[in-house]
């Protein structure tokens, strides 16, 4: 699995509830752009339209002389029951959203995208998470020196 692009900044601001894998419908020049690692998932999100799920604001940089919309809406390929389950979880949670966490090549050289159902975190939650990580690092460091 070769990672094309990560959305670390986007994932930092949210608490991940669930993750899903989906295919993505791309044009030829977008695939070439992905192979050249010129994809940005910053400020991108997913939305539902007529029972289908779409990726919005993902930027595939222009490849060579092709003149097309770099941030067009791209259809995500998922099973119908997965889409329905994701939609119901989204409505059940209320203040939640779906953002892409990473885009990658799978073992068969297909471009896949990992999307995450997330809820926004407040500053206090972020601070608690940072403290928790620091404590875990400290404990690992102490245990490493003991053994």
UniProtKB/Swiss-Prot annotation:
Keyword Protein biosynthesis: no
Alphabetical list of Gene3D superfamilies matching this protein: 2.40.280.10
Main location class: cytoplasm
Pfam families: SmpB (PF01668)
Compartments where found: Cytoplasm
Alphabetically ordered keywords of this record: Cytoplasm, RNA-binding
GO cellular component: cytosol
Coiled-coil regions listed in the entry: none
Molecular functions per Gene Ontology: RNA binding
GO biological process: trans-translation
Function description: Required for rescue of stalled ribosomes mediated by trans-translation. Binds to transfer-messenger RNA (tmRNA), required for stable association of tmRNA with ribosomes. tmRNA and SmpB together mimic tRNA shape, replacing the anticodon stem-loop with SmpB. tmRNA is encoded by the ssrA gene; the 2 termini fold to resemble tRNA(Ala) and it encodes a 'tag peptide', a short internal open reading frame. During trans-translation Ala-aminoacylated tmRNA acts like a tRNA, entering the A-site of stalled ribosomes, displacing the stalled mRNA.
UniProt record similarity statement: Belongs to the SmpB family.
The protein's name in its UniProt record: SsrA-binding protein
Upper taxonomic lineage: Bacteria, Bacillati, Mycoplasmatota, Mycoplasmoidales, Metamycoplasmataceae
């Amino acid at each position: 699995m070769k990672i094309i692009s990560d959305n670390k900044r986007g994932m930092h601001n949210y608490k991940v509830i669930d993750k899903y894998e989906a295919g993505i419908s791309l044009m030829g020049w977008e695939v070439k752009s992905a192979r050249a690692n010129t994809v940005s998932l910053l400020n991108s999100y997913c939305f539902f339209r007529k029972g289908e799920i779409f990726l919005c604001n993902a930027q595939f940089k222009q490849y060579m002389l092709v003149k097309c919309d770099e941030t067009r809406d791209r259809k995500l390929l998922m099973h119908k029951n997965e889409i329905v389950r994701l939609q119901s979880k989204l409505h059940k949670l209320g203040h939640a959203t779906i953002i892409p966490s990473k885009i990658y090549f799978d073992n068969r050289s297909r471009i896949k995208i990992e999307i995450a159902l997330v809820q926004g975190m407040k500053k206090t939650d972020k601070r608690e998470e940072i403290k928790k990580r620091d404590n875990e690092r400290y404990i690992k460091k102490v245990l490493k020196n003991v053994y």
